[in-house]
């Protein structure tokens, strides 16, 4: 495998260059703006392209060293691509709602994950049948709530080594927690956002469904490339694996790697977004 390639045409077709209405701009993004058209800021893709390449390189290197990537995107149009991309490369995601303290209070979050796993086990082995209807319904409600909030990180086993964010305005709490802990941040930053706190900026549209799908796909493929490098370093003969089994090998290794890791401390359109 190799670091994913992408063209300027792909960025254009996905609408990556469309920013927000000019009156909503954040001056901190001025250097990445090419101009405006019909009252909409246009991002400079000659800057976006190499900055996205750099972000992919960082993702690959992080995973190649055995690091964990946390995908973060809780806005409606980001939820499915974020989850799909993370699962495809055996990484982790938060796509429902960022819970305060997810990173900075990991011990408490770990307890909630343990609770989710406990309920899942009881559901699977039929233990819930011995409870009253009220108790069973209470557990089922807890299970649904915990799965939505923590299902994407239930096997993470510790703090991530890097987070990838869609929409820095919406996910400002996640970025603040990452910065407090010294966790690098890769993020798509639109014209109405501040790049402060982002280590690897990807200037781009953070609302269009096609743009979000493109970012997530590229990040996922970069992570897969990093995992392939990790497997090769571990002596796995990737050439001997059947087509498609690299991803399976990665998925099988991920939970084991998480267990071995030391415990950590505590319908958007493909056009500029309308006013909220």
UniProtKB/Swiss-Prot annotation:
This is Small ribosomal subunit protein uS2. SUPFAM superfamilies: Ribosomal protein S2. The keyword Methyltransferase does not apply. Keywords: Ribonucleoprotein, Ribosomal protein. Residues 252-276 have a biased composition (Low complexity). One of its GO terms (biological process) is translation. GO terms for cellular component: cytosolic small ribosomal subunit. Residues 251-276 are annotated as: Disordered. It comes from the Bacteria. It holds the Pfam family Ribosomal_S2. The lineage of its organism: Bacteria, Pseudomonadati, Pseudomonadota, Alphaproteobacteria, Rhodobacterales. Belongs to the universal ribosomal protein uS2 family. One of its GO terms (molecular function) is structural constituent of ribosome. The keyword Ribosomal protein applies.
